[in-house]
């Protein structure tokens, strides 16, 4: 698969041949769903907690005698049906993380890259670098490239000026190549890779 390399100014900078094993797969939604679910589960804090009937600060003694009142039979006022009682089956502190094999994670990343390539939402940029940390200039360059909602992946190190300028633009994310992940790829409309990022990805999956 051949793609044209462009500069931030929108000029042609040659062509690059992409590895079909990384960018040319037929995307599988089930694999992408598994990886996204795994990522989001790892992010979930899991510190939610509601007081059950054993946690409520209230007497545990019987409310009133069993017989002779004409009222319903009850024991403790900690029961869930009473105001101030404990919650029934409420959330508890737990870890939402679950296992996903490394091979499935790697396959998910390749399928996400292939999905963007298949949808023509993959752009290769010569270099993600800026002489000045000027957001206005970068917005103008992105407009020429049609980037309104995009994830930009640079090399191992992101140019400081480019990072600073891009951080002020809504719906634009910038990550080094080691931070690339399925969820961020899929949540943005366009995927922009630098030449260095393409080389690093092909080396990673070699």
UniProtKB/Swiss-Prot annotation:
InterPro entries: Ribosomal_uL4, Ribosomal_uL4-like, Ribosomal_uL4_dom_sf. Residues 42-94 are annotated as: Disordered. GO terms for cellular component: ribonucleoprotein complex; ribosome. GO terms for molecular function: rRNA binding; structural constituent of ribosome. The keyword Cytoplasm does not apply. Gene3D superfamilies: 3.40.1370.10. SUPFAM superfamilies: Ribosomal protein L4. Belongs to the universal ribosomal protein uL4 family. PANTHER family: 50S RIBOSOMAL PROTEIN L4, LARGE RIBOSOMAL SUBUNIT PROTEIN UL4M. This is Large ribosomal subunit protein uL4. It comes from Brucella canis (strain ATCC 23365 / NCTC 10854 / RM-666).
